[in-house]
């Protein structure tokens, strides 16, 4: 290795920065995060550094550099656009065996600044040794996204308990297993949810040998495209012991689940295999009570026609910790991939989401509200009742010529979008593969212009709506 990675304690140690511009300010801010005593030499300071001097956070010691300024400092940074001055700083520092960094000049660096992921006291440094700074930055961005924000507080709390854990658990193996279980279990989840005091109590309980504490995370998988799964959702499924998934979760997303996790199908469809909701609710509770990290993985968003609230009510009644990771609901994802904006200043000032699959004792639908003009109506699970939906909307004032779309398998490679009018909605729905979403409203007329996803956009001739009259024409 060309550089030996070292973490330096700069707390109250003097560091000299030569330069007063933007690059110098960037280095100064990094050094201040480490509580260094920053001394500045520069002809003039930019506004940011001037403010730091006025706040007594840094010391402006001189306008001109001379060798004596290096005598009692721990590190030296040269951050000017004057090559001759940078060379002078480097030579003086080298002659006095001081570690020096000349910014953007690898040949004149006895130490370099890595890209930093800061979850203090947890820190990760990434460096290419100056060979590929952009690559190091890209790696840092990926790690930044993958490492949860609560790592720092987790390390802080754990550090304060190390002595007590060592007293109670006598062997290294016992302590290792304890910490691994703690960091991968309910303790971590509570910290993730910002429940600090509850997490401390959990740690104390974990020291009781017969204690087992599981938890449940309700995760929205999004509409199908694995790229639309959130980073937090990805973290959850890669830490799970058990994943209960439904029929709307794509195979691509299931491939991202931790390899040794148990996968349990609990899906339901309007027609086909069914798993009773009560059975799913109880299974979630039972698995958590066994001390397992359970993920309930749902298509779309768990709180949008996903019955997520019903499942969490059961967990709450039994005192089982849970968390929720929202997902992109189908109405958002599928319409975006179909080039249909849900709102548009000229055509729709509101959007309404409804389900076509309701409880048997559900109250009557307010068709008059749903049939309003200047709004977009999105119907989940409505293809089997498309004829009734079309008839009712027309009965309450929606024109038969109102544009409609039936989007099947939204955001996936197999996505298929059919365009028509309210008059022939039932016919479109009958041909639509499931799962499918119905969109009703003038915004559908923008599909032909804004569609961007899927090769069939260019391979097929679709009905075209003129934006003023909404009269159906055929593309010549």
From Swiss-Prot:
Its EC number is 2.1.1.107, 1.3.1.76, 4.99.1.4. Residues 214-476 are annotated as: Uroporphyrinogen-III C-methyltransferase. NAD(+) binds at residues 22-23, 43-44. Pathway: Cofactor biosynthesis; adenosylcobalamin biosynthesis; precorrin-2 from uroporphyrinogen III: step 1/1; Cofactor biosynthesis; adenosylcobalamin biosynthesis; sirohydrochlorin from precorrin-2: step 1/1; Porphyrin-containing compound metabolism; siroheme biosynthesis; precorrin-2 from uroporphyrinogen III: step 1/1; Porphyrin-containing compound metabolism; siroheme biosynthesis; siroheme from sirohydrochlorin: step 1/1. One of its GO terms (molecular function) is NAD binding. InterPro entries: 4pyrrol_Mease, 4pyrrol_Methylase_sf, 4pyrrole_Mease_sub1, 4pyrrole_Mease_sub2, CobA/CysG_C, NAD(P)-bd_dom_sf, Siro_Cobalamin_biosynth, Sirohaem_synt_dimer_dom_sf. PROSITE patterns: SUMT_1 (PS00839), SUMT_2 (PS00840). It catalyses: uroporphyrinogen III + 2 S-adenosyl-L-methionine = precorrin-2 + 2 S-adenosyl-L-homocysteine + H(+); precorrin-2 + NAD(+) = sirohydrochlorin + NADH + 2 H(+); siroheme + 2 H(+) = sirohydrochlorin + Fe(2+). In the N-terminal section; belongs to the precorrin-2 dehydrogenase / sirohydrochlorin ferrochelatase family. Then it catalyzes the NAD-dependent ring dehydrogenation of precorrin-2 to yield sirohydrochlorin. Finally, it catalyzes the ferrochelation of sirohydrochlorin to yield siroheme. This is Siroheme synthase. It comes from Mannheimia succiniciproducens (strain KCTC 0769BP / MBEL55E). The gene is cysG.
């Amino acid at each position: 290795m060309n550089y030996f990675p070292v973490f330096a304690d700069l707390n109250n140690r003097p560091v000299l920065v030569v330069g007063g511009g933007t690059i110098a300010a960037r280095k100064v801010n990094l050094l201040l995060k480490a509580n260094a005593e920053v001394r500045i030499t520069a002809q003039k300071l930019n506004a940011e550094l001037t403010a730091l001097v006025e706040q007594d956070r840094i010391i402006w010691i001189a306008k001109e550099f001379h060798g004596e300024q290096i005598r009692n400092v721990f590190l030296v940074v040269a951050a000017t656009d004057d090559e001759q001055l940078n060379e002078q700083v480097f030579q003086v520092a080298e002659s006095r065996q001081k570690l020096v960094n000349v910014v953007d000049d690898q040949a004149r660096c006895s130490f370099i600044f890595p890209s930093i992921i800061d979850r203090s006291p947890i820190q990760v440094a990434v460096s290419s040794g100056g060979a590929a700074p952009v690559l190091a930055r890209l790696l840092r961005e990926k790690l930044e996204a993958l490492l949860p924000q609560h790592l720092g507080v987790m390390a802080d709390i754990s550090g304060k308990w190390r002595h007590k854990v060592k007293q109670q658990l006598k062997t290294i193996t016992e302590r290792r297993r304890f910490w691994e279980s703690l960091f991968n279990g309910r303790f971590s989840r509570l910290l993730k949810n910002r429940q600090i005091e509850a997490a401390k109590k959990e740690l104390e309980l974990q020291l009781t040998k017969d204690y087992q504490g599981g938890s449940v995370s309700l995760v929205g998988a999004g509409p199908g495209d694995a790229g639309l799964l959130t980073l937090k959702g990805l973290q959850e499924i890669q830490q799970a012991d058990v994943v209960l998934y439904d029929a709307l979760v794509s195979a691509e997303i299931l491939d991202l689940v931790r390899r040794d996790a148990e996968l349990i199908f609990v899906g339901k469809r309007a027609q086909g295999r069914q798993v009773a909701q009560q059975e799913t609710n109880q299974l979630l509770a039972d698995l958590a009570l066994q001390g397992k990290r359970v993920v309930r993985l749902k298509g779309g968003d768990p709180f949008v026609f996903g019955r997520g609230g019903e499942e969490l009510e059961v967990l709450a009644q039994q005192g089982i910790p849970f968390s929720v990771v929202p997902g992109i609901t189908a109405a958002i994802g599928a319409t975006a991939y179909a080039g249909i904006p849900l709102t548009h200043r000229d055509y729709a000032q509101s959007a309404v989401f409804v389900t076509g699959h309701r409880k048997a004792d559900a109250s009557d639908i307010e068709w008059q509200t749903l049939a309003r003009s200047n709004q977009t109506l999105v119907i989940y699970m409505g293809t089997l009742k498309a004829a009734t939906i079309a008839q009712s909307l027309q009965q309450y004032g929606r024109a038969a010529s109102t544009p409609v779309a039936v989007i099947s398998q939204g955001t996936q490679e197999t996505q298929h979008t059919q365009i028509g009018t309210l008059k022939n909605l039932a016919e479109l729905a009958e041909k639509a593969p499931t799962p499918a979403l119905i969109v009703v409203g003038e915004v559908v007329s923008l599909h032909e212009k804004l569609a961007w996803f899927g090769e069939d956009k260019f391979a097929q001739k679709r009905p075209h709506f003129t934006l003023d009259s909404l009269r159906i024409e055929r593309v010549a």
